[in-house]
């Protein structure tokens, strides 16, 4: 049996000094020999998705200790992508994922912790912790802070649901008065929690359920609802059990790499496609798979996207449905249940909470069970009161939405679309692929051709859109915003939001080697690989070149002959692969270090040391 890692610092005469330091943290004689569990928190007052986590780490810690473990809490950083958006702060968002993964590794290995509970929530925090968990491969349970309630505002004599994106779009739309913009701003983000739609944070927290590393309801139970407290309490007890099973019973089935296998990654991506998750999840799953030493690639995502239907449409794809509605319909277990019915999942694999996913679905899918407890759990409703306090309300719907024909979650037979919610496109513009969230694309523009309007940065694109330089039929092309070229692969939420505000959301396309916020929708194609800074063809496109987009056939093509492309490449090789215009962008040493090691989006934008 493997020895407890913590014995390195708690046992032996030579560790008297280390034990002395442990005692100074509150440990007593009877604690030496118990599993030491790292409570990896991410509380910060900068981020609404994390503002309520301060006391939740200690809640988990108390449960760990009541179950016979020793809990030691530490914190990671957490960047709010919405606040960092639209300025140079966004350069730091994706690189922060690597810092989070590294910081977890540093703390856990430096102190020889035996297992972890990861308390995450927002965009880069869940992926960073997931990467660390698979890198370390010690028992882990994920529990996130939970989704925000959707905002609501009285608009033209009716109540309209809102989220962060509505505020951004309204601010750039001249049809809205200042008073109307303020009303939307005040209502868009009413509570603590991760932004209320199927944006990156909620997408990733949902995927931890499919990967088998979190408890049912983790992705969809509202941050404000009292039901969410149970997830934290159970996580504390569960992690002690998992640690004992591994270290005392030699049960390797509880390790992250035994749970998050290739099949589990397929399940997670299948879920992502079915629920129209954020395109950022592609980056993060590819990165996590590499940490797990699993050969899960863009080719696998492409394969899955061709056979998985869209079973759930959530904001930003539709404005009336948010995470609270997904939970009301049975949450992620409800979507996984329909995917299983369609034969699209591998359910023989284990989870942290059940022997197999199949058994978990039998217990937690509201269409399979009559359990009063399960149906009550998924009836949790928004409280409708602005708050930054977790577990502060107990409102419920009268009953769960089990309508799989016209409800929020559909069966395969009644799918919103038989074609998946995410697609990988290939062509001479993106030889290694690019990603589009098809769930957010109007059917009328699934095939689109138009002239390229070239911008060497997100900033210049925003000015071009707001100044009326973009016309219906144009393709906005933003380059040198990839992992290396940015550096940091900025999100393009402002350009997509401003296209909407100008009435161009269904009349234009946007292509970039950067990425998109989970809040983006429309014909927004990102992650173009290779990126411009790596010599990708996107760096050779010139103003007015025609680009053909064919989502049904998964193609993207620059309509320029090969000889001309070769001539341009030779010219660019001589001039150097850099933006044609100078950008007023301060690149710090930290960002330069990331850029020096960053790989392409097709590889998850992870770091790779030079050979």
Swiss-Prot record:
List, in alphabetical order, the Gene Ontology terms for molecular function in this entry. 2 iron, 2 sulfur cluster binding; dihydroxy-acid dehydratase activity; magnesium ion binding
Q: How is the cofactor bound?
A: Binds 1 [2Fe-2S] cluster per subunit. This cluster acts as a Lewis acid cofactor.
Entry cofactors:
[2Fe-2S] cluster; Mg(2+)
Database matches in InterPro entries? Dihydro-acid_dehy_C, DihydroxyA_deHydtase, DiOHA_6PGluconate_deHydtase_CS, ILV_EDD_C, ILV_EDD_N, IlvD/EDD_N
- Reactions the enzyme catalyzes: (2R)-2,3-dihydroxy-3-methylbutanoate = 3-methyl-2-oxobutanoate + H2O; (2R,3R)-2,3-dihydroxy-3-methylpentanoate = (S)-3-methyl-2-oxopentanoate + H2O
What EC number(s) are associated with this protein in UniProt?
4.2.1.9
**Record's superkingdom?**
Bacteria
**In this UniProt entry, which cysteines form S-S bonds?**
none
- Give a yes or no for keyword Disulfide bond in this entry: no
What does the record give as its pathway?
Amino-acid biosynthesis; L-isoleucine biosynthesis; L-isoleucine from 2-oxobutanoate: step 3/4; Amino-acid biosynthesis; L-valine biosynthesis; L-valine from pyruvate: step 3/4
Family to which this protein belongs: Belongs to the IlvD/Edd family.
**Role, per record:** Functions in the biosynthesis of branched-chain amino acids. Catalyzes the dehydration of (2R,3R)-2,3-dihydroxy-3-methylpentanoate (2,3-dihydroxy-3-methylvalerate) into 2-oxo-3-methylpentanoate (2-oxo-3-methylvalerate) and of (2R)-2,3-dihydroxy-3-methylbutanoate (2,3-dihydroxyisovalerate) into 2-oxo-3-methylbutanoate (2-oxoisovalerate), the penultimate precursor to L-isoleucine and L-valine, respectively.
NCBIfam families assigned to the protein according to its UniProt record, in alphabetical order: ilvD, PRK12448.1
Name of the molecule in the record: Dihydroxy-acid dehydratase
Q: Give the organism the record lists.
A: Brucella suis (strain ATCC 23445 / NCTC 10510)
């Amino acid at each position: 049996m493997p020895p407890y890692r913590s014995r390195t610092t708690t046992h032996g005469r030579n560790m008297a000094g280390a034990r002395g330091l442990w005692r100074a943290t509150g440990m007593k004689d009877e604690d030496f020999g118990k599993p030491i569990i790292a409570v990896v928190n991410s509380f910060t007052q900068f981020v609404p998705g994390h503002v309520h986590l301060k006391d939740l780490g200690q809640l988990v810690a108390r449960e760990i200790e009541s179950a016979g473990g020793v809990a030691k809490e530490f914190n990671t950083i957490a960047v709010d992508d919405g606040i960092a958006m639209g300025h140079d702060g966004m350069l730091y968002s994706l690189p922060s994922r690597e810092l989070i993964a590294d910081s977890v590794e540093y703390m856990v290995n430096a102190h020889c912790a035996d297992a972890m509970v990861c308390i995450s929530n927002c965009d880069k925090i869940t992926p960073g912790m997931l990467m660390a968990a698979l890198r370390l491969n010690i028992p882990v349970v994920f529990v996130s802070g939970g989704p925000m309630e959707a905002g609501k505002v009285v608009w033209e004599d009716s109540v309209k649901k809102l989220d962060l994106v509505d505020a951004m779009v309204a601010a750039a739309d001249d049809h809205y008065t200042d008073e109307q913009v303020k009303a939307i701003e005040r209502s868009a983000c009413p509570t603590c929690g991760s932004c209320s739609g199927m944006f990156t944070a909620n997408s990733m927290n949902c995927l931890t359920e499919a990967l088998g590393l979190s408890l049912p309801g983790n992705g969809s139970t509202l941050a404000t609802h009292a039901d969410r407290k149970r997830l934290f309490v159970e996580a504390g007890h569960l992690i002690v059990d998992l640690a004992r099973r591994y270290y005392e019973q030699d049960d390797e089935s509880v390790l992250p790499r035994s749970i998050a296998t290739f099949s589990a990654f397929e399940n997670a991506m299948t879920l992502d496609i079915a629920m129209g998750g954020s395109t950022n999840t592609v980056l993060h799953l590819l990165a996590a798979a590499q940490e797990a030493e699993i050969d899960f690639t863009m080719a696998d995502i492409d394969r899955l996207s061709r056979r998985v239907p869209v079973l759930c449409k959530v904001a930003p794809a539709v404005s009336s449905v948010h995470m609270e509605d997904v939970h009301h319909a049975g949450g992620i277990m409800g979507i996984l249940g329909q995917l299983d019915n369609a034969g699209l999942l591998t359910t023989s694999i284990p989870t942290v909470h059940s022997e197999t996913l199949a058994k978990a679905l039998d217990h937690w899918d509201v269409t399979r069970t009559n359990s009063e407890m399960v149906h009550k759990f998924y009836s949790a409703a928004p409280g409708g009161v602005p708050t930054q306090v977790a577990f502060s309300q107990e409102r419920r719907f009268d009953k769960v939405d089990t309508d799989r024909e016209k409800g929020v979650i559909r069966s395969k037979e009644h799918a919103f679309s038989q074609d998946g919610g995410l697609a990988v496109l290939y062509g001479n513009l993106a030889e290694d692929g690019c990603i589009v969230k098809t769930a957010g694309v109007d059917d009328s523009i699934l095939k689109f051709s138009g002239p390229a309007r070239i911008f060497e940065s997100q900033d210049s694109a925003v000015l071009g859109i707001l100044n009326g330089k973009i016309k219906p039929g144009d393709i906005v092309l933003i380059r040198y915003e990839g992992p290396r070229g940015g550096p940091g692969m900025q999100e393009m939420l402002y350009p997509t939001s401003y296209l909407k505000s100008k009435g161009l959301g269904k009349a234009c396309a946007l292509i970039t080697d950067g990425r998109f916020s989970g809040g983006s929708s429309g014909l927004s194609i990102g992650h173009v690989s290779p990126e411009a800074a790596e010599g990708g063809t996107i760096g050779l496109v010139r103003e007015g070149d025609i680009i053909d987009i064919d989502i049904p056939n998964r193609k993207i093509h620059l309509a320029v002959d090969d000889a001309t492309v070769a001539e341009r490449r030779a010219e660019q090789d001589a001039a150097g692969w850099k933006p044609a215009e100078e950008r007023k962008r301060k690149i710090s040493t930290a960002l330069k270090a990331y850029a020096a090691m960053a790989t392409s989006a097709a590889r998850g934008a992870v770091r790779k040391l030079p050979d």
